[in-house]
């Protein structure tokens, strides 16, 4: 069991902010509602992603010829030796990034920026809670792959379509609960039988749902605010929304 206060063990690391022009190498469909696009290119040299919580900006040409569309995505897997970066796209809604991912083919060009920095959560907490919707699934999957044997983790995931509820490989001991709505996600976390010891809770998804989740974790369940990291990856009725939720 870790003895230091969580705030003293979480690391915030800054990275050189660069844009990189890349090429689509491969397009895979892990489940019907997702595309996994693998990029390559000489400009990937020096790319860094130190945390599953990281995000890069994807720049896409606007349909009206105006300013490029910008959307945030998790670096799902970076292979420095192979010179590849994989990003998974949740195909929810009809936005420009989902449309681009649906029609992407090998040889297409794309530009990414970042990550600007990393919020590094140690793996040696007594337990880890990961909660989110489809947009958080790539980050959750990456985190579970990174957790070592002997670690205990709980994942509560709002993924409405059964076909998109995939296996989540991990060396850790993982309890996964799938739910059908944001409200059900919050309720499931409220009812979750968490163990003793020092844990860390991470969540990402729709802004309103994540605000409610943070209130449950901090106000109702009594978790230390420094042991909770909740972010809005999108907001109902808004575009290009991404924020860390503090209250």
Where do the protein language model's features map onto the residues?
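Extended, composition-driven regions rather than compact fold-specific motifs
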Residues: 1-247
């Amino acid at each position: 069991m870790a003895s230091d206060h969580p705030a003293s063990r979480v690391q915030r690391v800054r990275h050189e902010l660069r844009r990189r022009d890349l090429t689509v190498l491969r397009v895979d469909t892990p489940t019907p509602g997702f595309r996994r696009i693998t990029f390559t290119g000489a400009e990937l040299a020096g790319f860094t992603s130190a945390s599953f919580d990281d995000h890069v900006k994807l720049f896409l040409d606007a349909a009206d010829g105006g300013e490029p569309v910008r959307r945030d995505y998790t670096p799902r897997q970076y292979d420095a030796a192979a010179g590849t970066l994989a990003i998974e796209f949740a195909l929810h809604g009809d936005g420009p990034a989902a449309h681009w991912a649906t029609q992407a083919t090998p040889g297409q060009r794309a530009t990414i920026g970042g990550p600007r920095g990393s919020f590094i959560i140690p793996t040696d907490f007594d337990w880890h809670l990961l909660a989110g919707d489809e947009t958080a699934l790539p980050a959750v999957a990456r985190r579970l792959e990174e957790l070592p044997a002997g670690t205990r983790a709980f994942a509560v995931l709002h993924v409405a379509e059964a076909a998109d509820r995939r296996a989540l490989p991990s060396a850790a001991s993982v309890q996964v609960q799938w739910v059908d709505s944001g409200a059900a996600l919050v309720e499931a976390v409220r009812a979750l039988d968490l163990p003793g010891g020092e844990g860390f809770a991470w969540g990402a998804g729709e802004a309103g749902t994540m605000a409610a989740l943070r209130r449950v974790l901090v106000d109702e369940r009594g978790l230390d605010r420094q042991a909770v990291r909740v972010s809005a990856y999108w907001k109902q009725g808004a575009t290009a929304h991404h924020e860390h939720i503090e209250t």
